[in-house]
């Protein structure tokens, strides 16, 4: 089956805007039952500048004619989770997707924004402001150092520091100041899927592409889940949609242009550093020559003084 590559922001955004797919995606990743999920009024994107008129730039100056393409995409949801003890709790689900490890500080900035939020929730006595717990999901288009797992969960444990035992009870105040994190390393997604999580991740596997831009791929794994089927069908439709394919191609060129600009900037820095090193070597050579000239002058003066002494001795001997 021909489907659109969901790592492209325009495609992933379409998936997350579908409530059923978003619920299935989050529920499968965090491994908890979600009773309800709603996207918050905005999604945040970081925009990278790319050339509007040229596919490839010869110099960094060429990047002055630009347009904007998404570099980071972020979605925020409010979800009601059914806990293992049968109770319900509201949480904020933050999903961030990026292809570069250099986006770490942006991730931290977005997280700080969430901690500053004041959410209004319904309670028995009416509406109240409340700091909801946060769950972060990061989709990474790069590999983390020394970790080969495709999906990683970093969770909080309450530990009694005196007895060194785990505390099973949870506290809303503590939960509001800490959060669980889920990390998906897209480059490590590979192999035949077996579990529900692996089947979901298999959609993001970066293999079996039809073109060099990696916009379209062949998905041939068995589908035995209605939600997964709906997700794949949406990707199939996106693959045949001219507007979506054009947006994916533009994003691919944006990425290529950004890589080229980074290469040129790196090349310019290396050239500047090499020139600086050469200038330093030339300056050191100049100083060395000056020192040698001084040494020669001193030797000449010494010889001149000795010659004078010899002449004086000769005059004295003639007397």
Model-flagged regions — what are they?
Residues 1-179:
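Accessory alpha/beta interaction modules
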Residues 2-6, 84, 91-96, 202-319:
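Short, charged alpha-helical interaction segments and adjacent helix-coil junctions
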Residues 9, 19-23, 105, 134, ...:
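Non-catalytic, well-ordered alpha-helical scaffold segments
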Residues 12-17, 187-191, 218-222, 226:
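Generic amphipathic alpha-helical segments used as scaffolds and interaction surfaces in large
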Residues 26, 137, 184, 231, ...:
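A residue-level signal for conserved active-site and pocket-lining positions in enzyme catalytic cores
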Residues 125-128, 187, 235-236:
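Selected N-terminal structured segments and early membrane-anchoring regions
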Residues 148-150, 193-198, 247:
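Short conserved micro-motifs at the rims of enzyme active sites and ligand-binding pockets
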Residues 163-164, 168-210:
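Extended serine/threonine-enriched, polar tracts that run as long, contiguous segments within proteins
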């Amino acid at each position: 089956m021909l489907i659109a590559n969901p790592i492209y922001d325009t495609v992933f955004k379409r998936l997350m805007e579908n409530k059923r797919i978003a619920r299935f995606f989050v529920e499968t990743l965090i491994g908890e039952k979600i009773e309800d999920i709603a996207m918050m009024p905005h999604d945040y994107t970081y925009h990278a500048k790319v050339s509007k008129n040229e596919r490839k730039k010869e110099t960094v100056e060429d990047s002055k004619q630009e347009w904007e393409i998404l570099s980071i995409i972020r979605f925020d949801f409010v979800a009601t989770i059914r806990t293992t003890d049968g109770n319900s709790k509201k949480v904020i689900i933050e999903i961030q997707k990026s292809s570069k490890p250099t986006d770490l500080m942006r991730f931290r900035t977005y997280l700080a924004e969430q901690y500053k939020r004041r959410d209004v929730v319904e309670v028995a006595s009416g509406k109240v402001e409340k700091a909801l717990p946060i769950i972060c999901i990061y989709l990474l288009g790069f590999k983390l150092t020394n970790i080969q797992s495709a999906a990683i969960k970093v969770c909080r444990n309450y530990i009694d520091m005196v007895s060194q035992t785990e505390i099973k009870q949870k506290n809303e105040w503590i939960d509001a100041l800490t959060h669980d994190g889920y990390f998906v390393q897209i480059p490590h997604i590979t192999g035949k899927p077996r579990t529900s999580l692996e089947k979901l991740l298999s959609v993001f596997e970066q293999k079996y592409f039809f073109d060099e831009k990696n916009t379209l791929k062949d998905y041939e794994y068995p589908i035995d889940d209605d939600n997964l089927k709906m997700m794949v069908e949406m990707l199939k439709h996106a693959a045949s949609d001219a507007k979506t394919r054009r947006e994916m191609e533009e994003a691919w060129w944006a990425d290529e242009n950004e890589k080229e600009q980074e290469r040129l900037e790196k090349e310019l820095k290396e050239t500047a550093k090499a020139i600086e090193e050469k200038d330093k070597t030339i300056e050191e050579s100049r100083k060395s020559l000056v020192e040698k000239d001084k040494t020669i002058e001193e030797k000449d003066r010494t010889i001149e003084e000795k010659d004078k002494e010899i002449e004086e001795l000769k005059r004295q001997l003639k007397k």
